[in-house]
From Swiss-Prot:
It is found in: Host endoplasmic reticulum membrane. Disulfide bonds: none annotated. Residues 1-13, 96-115 are cytoplasmic. Residues 35-74 are lumenal. TGBp1, TGBp2 and TGBp3 seem to act together for cell-to-cell propagation. TGBp1 is the main movement protein that physically cross the plasmodesma with the viral genome. TGBp2 and TGBp3 would facilitate TGBp1 function. It comes from the Viruses. This is Movement protein TGB2. The keyword ATP-binding does not apply. It comes from Potato virus X (strain CP) (PVX). Keywords: Host endoplasmic reticulum, Host membrane, Membrane, Transmembrane, Transmembrane helix, Transport, Viral movement protein. GO terms for biological process: transport of virus in host, cell to cell. Belongs to the Tymovirales TGBp2 protein family. GO terms for cellular component: host cell endoplasmic reticulum membrane; membrane. The chain crosses the membrane at residues 14-34, 75-95.
Length: 115
C-alpha cells in the first residue's frame, strides 16, 4: 500500500443536525403546551361550560360560575400581590436608608452623610 491511497478526511460535522433536532423538539413542545386545555371539565356528558355560563332546556337547568369567580377583588390576584410585594420592599428599603444616621464610605474614598 502506498501513502497516496489513504487520505485523511475531517469527520462529518453533525452540529446542524443536533440544532435542527433541538429546535424541532422545542417547537413541538411549545405547540403541545399552548394547544392543550387546562380548564376544568364543567358540565355533563352533553353540555360543556368550561368558562361558566347557563343552560336551560325543558328538563334541566344548569348554572356554572367561571373558574375564578369570587377572587377578582381580593389580593390573591397575581398582579395585585406582585404590586404589593414590590411596594412593601421599596418602602422597607427607603425606611431603612432614612433611619440609618451613620456616615458611609463612598467609592471615591470620602465619607459622605447619608442625608
Amino acid at each position: 500500500m502506498s501513502a497516496q491511497g489513504h487520505r485523511l478526511t475531517a469527520p462529518v460535522n453533525s452540529e446542524k443536525v443536533y440544532i435542527v433536532l433541538g429546535l424541532s423538539f422545542a417547537l413541538i413542545s411549545i405547540t403541545f403546551l399552548l394547544s392543550r386545555s387546562n380548564l376544568p371539565h364543567v358540565g355533563d356528558n352533553i353540555h360543556s361550560l368550561p368558562h361558566g355560563g347557563a343552560y336551560r332546556d325543558g328538563t334541566k337547568a344548569v348554572l356554572y360560575n367561571s373558574p375564578n369567580f369570587g377572587s377578582r377583588t381580593s389580593l390573591s390576584n397575581g398582579k395585585n400581590a406582585a404590586f404589593a410585594v414590590v411596594l412593601l420592599l421599596s418602602l422597607l428599603i427607603y425606611g431603612s436608608r432614612c433611619l440609618s444616621q451613620r456616615n458611609h464610605l463612598c467609592a471615591c474614598g470620602n465619607n459622605h452623610s447619608s442625608h
